[in-house]
Amino acid sequence: MAGAEGFQYRAVYPFRRERPEDLELLPGDLLVVSRVALQALGVADGGERCPHNVGWMPGFNERTRQRGDFPGTYVEFLGPVALARPGPRPRGPRPLPARPLDGSSESGHILPDLAEQFSPPDPAPPILVKLVEAIEQAELDSECYSKPELPATRTDWSLSDLEQWDRTALYDAVKGFLLALPAAVVTPEAAAEAYRALREVAGPVGLVLEPPTLPLHQALTLRFLLQHLGRVARRAPSPDTAVHALASAFGPLLLRIPPSGGEGDGSEPVPDFPVLLLERLVQEHVEEQDAAPPALPPKPSKAKPAPTALANGGSPPSLQDAEWYWGDISREEVNERLRDTPDGTFLVRDASSKIQGEYTLTLRKGGNNKLIKVFHRDGHYGFSEPLTFCSVVELISHYRHESLAQYNAKLDTRLLYPVSKYQQDQVVKEDSIEAVGAQLKVYHQQYQDKSREYDQLYEEYTRTSQELQMKRTAIEAFNETIKIFEEQGQTQEKCSKEYLERFRREGNEKEMQRILLNSERLKSRIAEIHESRTKLEQDLRAQASDNREIDKRMNSLKPDLMQLRKIRDQYLVWLTQKGARQRKINEWLGIKNETEDQYSLMEDEDALPHHEERTWYVGKINRTQAEEMLSGKRDGTFLIRESSQRGCYACSVVVDGDTKHCVIYRTATGFGFAEPYNLYGSLKELVLHYQHASLVQHNDALTVTLAHPVRAPGPGPPSAAR
């Protein structure tokens, strides 16, 4: 233990407080124990690595910001930390609780998987729906909801006496429901994608946590809960404060194990990530609810003309054939399509819920995009009850001629200008490979400049967000300190009156002056703390305002980045289809052409081992097994395997000595790593293309080609440094 001020541990099992001095634990909680505390317990050097042998340990829970005792059998050792913590307090011997068995009921997981609890079109598990409905029928209270204490484990989920529950019991039951699930709502894989979305250029993080990244039942449950928490925050006196408090309470429940700082890099977990993620998600839902138009009132009964195709005796037009129907596209792409378009421009896409029959109409009005949900029940469609249209095509056709103002006075427009999926602009105007390459170089440079600007803003945003969190914590500490001093002042004032009266009778002027001086000093100290807190609150408000401005600047850059990336990609696709050499494309992109590998010298491309699928396709193995197969291999060694995402594959490739993973999508146009590159008729065609084409065009960190099939003969490990 010599040299380390403290040691960090991570909770493996949940633990419920048994005594006032105990700490509540959730899996993934980070705990710090001082070296002095362990020495006081008689722990020898090296003994800190075996917490199950130590017994009860005094420490600090970084999630709850509380100190207390926790059982060493419930945690695992992480490593030393340079954090000094107060020494232990004396306590008597106490037996340890039994270490929970993996998968046993000791952990409190008594509910079945979400997939076994409900099925679409239900929005969420019936238990959760009942609890939320009961809470929203009563007065919403974000303070009760955001308490860090964990509820007692519940074994009866029949909810038969729900009407008799008070507000606190309802709030605790929602948390207890999440704790009782056998697995976190946000899977580790989805959390890793969300972590990347927080760091990289992307749209709202909520779009990442949709199927197939997050399983359907988890995605529906998460969306239902986020909508509820968003309503709770909006009704709070201070929505921003409520969002942070709710995220602190629910983040560790929805995401029990924080992801590591990078993928496959062995970095330490990010302890605040569950809170940061949920804070962003709830904030997005609050903003979405604020931006959405008011609920549509019932539609007045009105005779509607028959569709033209039916009137002429033809068959009704198909939704798939409608020019304004774009299918499954993201909200960001919709925003891009409607950018700088006149009022009345519109398109229809599949709803983000991915439930069959649900659609979203996006309409341009007042320079903004208005989202209108298309409801569906029993084969009928509409914007609100009653649902009178027999198809989405019939619904849209009707409002090509009728104003939406009858539903919402602010939507005083018709569906005038459809965004046609058949008339997309031809971006590439040049007609020669050299001219297209030169223009690609210009767009790529613009994209890199914008990316650097965004990265700088993101670093500044992250830094200021951390500082804001520290200041919020400091204000909480000030509040506790003021409370202690004021209680001390009240006690002193009460006692001082008795002693002053006594010393006045005795004529002891010296003691009277000492008591009065102490009282004045205490009042002065309280005033100083109040003043410091006020100054800190002012700094917090100013910095929060600056932080919001940075966020706005980042958001304003995102559409430009997406547009430049899209244009650059279309130029790359054009060059690839025209047979441009990859070496030349690399020069235009400013990518250094690597030295020739053992296969690039082959005159006959048919002799490449890449033609043999058995050299690189390994079938159904998981990420860990793939990393084991590629361990110690040279850069560019790769394999293709089945992905955990249904209908997709995964490419695992060695980059700078580490194994990286990327999804290969299978779409109607072919295989590929991303749109618009899903062009390859088979996995073999894709592998042969990226044998000489760098993956860097898809991800700046993937500076390799698919050079060496993992099962091909030839040198495997990298050569030793000379």
From Swiss-Prot:
Annotated stretches, region: Disordered: 84-108, 287-319
Residue span, SH3 domain: 4-80
InterPro entries in UniProt: PI3K_P85_iSH2 (IPR032498), PI3K_p85beta_SH3 (IPR035586), PI3kinase_P85_cSH2 (IPR035020), PI3kinase_P85_nSH2 (IPR035022), Rho_GTPase_activation_prot (IPR008936), RhoGAP_dom (IPR000198), SH2 (IPR000980), SH2_dom_sf (IPR036860)
Phosphotyrosine: modified positions: Y458, Y599, Y649
PTM: Phosphorylated in response to signaling from activated receptor-type protein kinases. Dephosphorylated by PTPRJ. Dephosphorylated at Tyr-649 by PTPN13. Phosphorylation of Tyr-649 impairs while its dephosphorylation promotes interaction with FBXL2 and SCF(FBXL2)-mediated polyubiquitination.
Domain SH2 per the UniProt entry, residue ranges: 324-419, 616-710
GO biological process: cellular response to insulin stimulus; insulin receptor signaling pathway; intracellular glucose homeostasis; negative regulation of MAPK cascade; phosphatidylinositol 3-kinase/protein kinase B signal transduction; positive regulation of cell adhesion; positive regulation of protein import into nucleus; positive regulation of transcription by RNA polymerase II
Family annotation (CDD domains): iSH2_PIK3R2, SH2_cSH2_p85_like, SH2_nSH2_p85_like, SH3_PI3K_p85beta
Keywords: Phosphoprotein, Protein transport, Repeat, SH2 domain, SH3 domain, Stress response, Transport, Ubl conjugation
UniProt domain Rho-GAP: residue ranges: 112-293
Protein's UniProt keywords contain Membrane: no
Residues at the site labelled Arginine finger: K147
Signal sequence segment: none
Compositional bias (Pro residues): 87-98
CC annotations in GO: cytosol; focal adhesion; nucleus; phosphatidylinositol 3-kinase complex, class IA
PROSITE patterns according to UniProt: RHOGAP, SH2, SH3
GO molecular function: phosphatidylinositol 3-kinase regulatory subunit binding; phosphotyrosine residue binding; protein heterodimerization activity; protein phosphatase binding; receptor tyrosine kinase binding
Comment block on domains: The SH2 2 domain is required for interaction with FBXL2 and PTPN13.
Subunit record text: Heterodimer of a regulatory subunit PIK3R2 and a p110 catalytic subunit (PIK3CA, PIK3CB or PIK3CD). Interacts with AXL. Interacts with FLT1 (tyrosine-phosphorylated) and FLT4 (tyrosine-phosphorylated). Interacts with FBXL2; PIK3R2 is a substrate of the SCF(FBXL2) complex. Interacts with PTPN13; dephosphorylates PIK3R2. Interacts with NYAP1, NYAP2 and MYO16. Interacts with XBP1 isoform 2; the interaction is direct and induces translocation of XBP1 isoform 2 into the nucleus in a ER stress- and/or insulin-dependent but PI3K-independent manner.
Function description: Regulatory subunit of phosphoinositide-3-kinase (PI3K), a kinase that phosphorylates PtdIns(4,5)P2 (Phosphatidylinositol 4,5-bisphosphate) to generate phosphatidylinositol 3,4,5-trisphosphate (PIP3). PIP3 plays a key role by recruiting PH domain-containing proteins to the membrane, including AKT1 and PDPK1, activating signaling cascades involved in cell growth, survival, proliferation, motility and morphology.
Similarity field: Belongs to the PI3K p85 subunit family.
Name the record gives this protein: Phosphatidylinositol 3-kinase regulatory subunit beta
Organismal lineage: Eukaryota, Metazoa, Chordata, Craniata, Vertebrata
Gene of this entry: Pik3r2
